[in-house]
Amino acid sequence: MSEHFSIAHVTPYPWEAQENAVNRHVREVTARLAADGHEVLVLAPSHSQERVRESRRAIRAARGETAQLLHGAARDEPRVIAVGEVLEVTGGARRRPSALSIDVARTIEELLGTIELDFVHVHEPFAPSTSNAALRHSRALNIGSFHSSTERLLSTLLARRFVESFYGRLDARTASLPETAALMAKHFPADYEMVADDGGAASRYEQIYERLAARRHSLEGDPELAAKLSGRPLIDVDLHMHTDHSHDCATPVEVLLATAHAQGLGAIAVTDHNEISGALEARAQAEQAGVKVIVGEEVKTAEQGEVIGLFIEEKIPRGLTLQETVAEIKRQGGLVYVPHPFDRMHAVPDYEHLLAILDDVDAIEVFNPRVAIGAFNDEAVRFATKYRLPAGAGSDSHVAQGLGSARIRMHDFDGPQEFMQSLRDAEIVMGRSSLLY
């Protein structure tokens, strides 16, 4: 291994149950990973109130400096964080799954929301469990390992839709046995890599980690260009809006530009639906209006939702595949910007299609005030964070009053290269949210 990672392994079983096969596997694998130089944490429920109190004291002590929880973890015995007590629930003659207390979920959310991890590796992430809660709150690359070949009626039948919605966040899935892979594929179709619960598991996991990490975008920009831009003034930019050249908007270009100037916007991206004429008209009037205009288009693909091309010059026809649309944006020297990626009220690419174009995505919209549910924006933040994608925001305004309700504060730029460098250090300014805009 040439690269060392920060990794949290999460088990749903109380850590005291070391006779449990999954816990035994986690203990052996994490010890090996730590010995190989990785920074490893184990998150587990516990029956010990003292262990839970000790872990929470450590989390509180590390607030503001959460790296303390990882530093020193690269040793033969990784740090174990007891995230809370599990409550055994009995129901007549049948034993029901352990209940997950609110305190456990909050502790996991706090920990994973503040500590920087490369991977969250969840074992048996069925609901309700600590593993499932970790998957819900993770902002890292996620691996799900499935060990048992026993049918779980609660997760596969009663709570299937709920469980499946979070399994979409898994970037890789492994199964310990062929029977396990077959069972999981039956209920939750996907590719399951075989990783047996034996001495070679840690090496196989490392290979998966390296493969997934290679898909992340580079954090490094252009230092010389960054230094050049740092001397430029900060401007507010709205990256998503419409004019009356869109079928569902009645805002004239002149009104759009006047309102943008009045709202203090230094630059705007005009992104009409399947049309570029409004953006070209706006750019022609930009100097007089005192607002810089990025020519864009929000293109409806055949079956994979919408994607925005920024800094383009020619209209891209609707109805192409997602890959064809992206290729056309790139042919024009433009930038691929993914709007409202997880808003199920819009036509959006699903997780699988986003991964297929990941290498060509330049930026992703993480805040859109017109989404119906705020969790859609949260999901976009997670996706951008895990793959290190530059984050953007825009009002998606269809009426002039909505302009600037979401904006980016960034150093002034000329052209796509300077724009991307400036975007790396930009600040997202979130305003009011409304479906009316």
Label the model's feature ranges:
Residues 2-19:
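Nucleotide-activated donor-dependent transferases that construct or modify glycoconjugates
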Residues 2-4, 32-119:
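A conserved catalytic-core segment of Leloir-type glycosyltransferases
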Residues 101, 122-127:
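Short His-centered aromatic/hydrophobic patch
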Residues 119-121, 132-152, 167, 174:
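Active-site proximal beta-strand in glycosyltransferases
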Residues 150, 156-173, 187:
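Membrane-proximal helix-turn-helix segments that form the acceptor-binding/catalytic region
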Residues 181-197, 203-209:
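Helix-loop-beta element that forms the nucleotide-linked donor phosphate-binding surface
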